[in-house]
């Protein structure tokens, strides 16, 4: 069972301060992709990734993107009832996203909303 998410105002404050680098590593482990690949999805270069690791903290915009992926993985886990199924779904091309994987689609906020819409349709049994 996952821990209860903190209230929105607390998450917003944490994002504005910049999340700890460790939270990037936790999401990387949960999604099960290489750290450099996740960083690229967050628009973080290799050299910047090393600087963030040394500093121990992400910038607010990077933190916001990190939370976007975390939120989608949580939503997919709720829908599929299992983190392994959610993880597999997030990595594979989906017809409802034009043959693009949810991880790739969610690199933008608009794409993330489409992934959330698709998860909602799956939850209600509308797979198109």
Predicted regions and their residues:
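Non-transmembrane "mature" sequence context
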Residues: 1-128
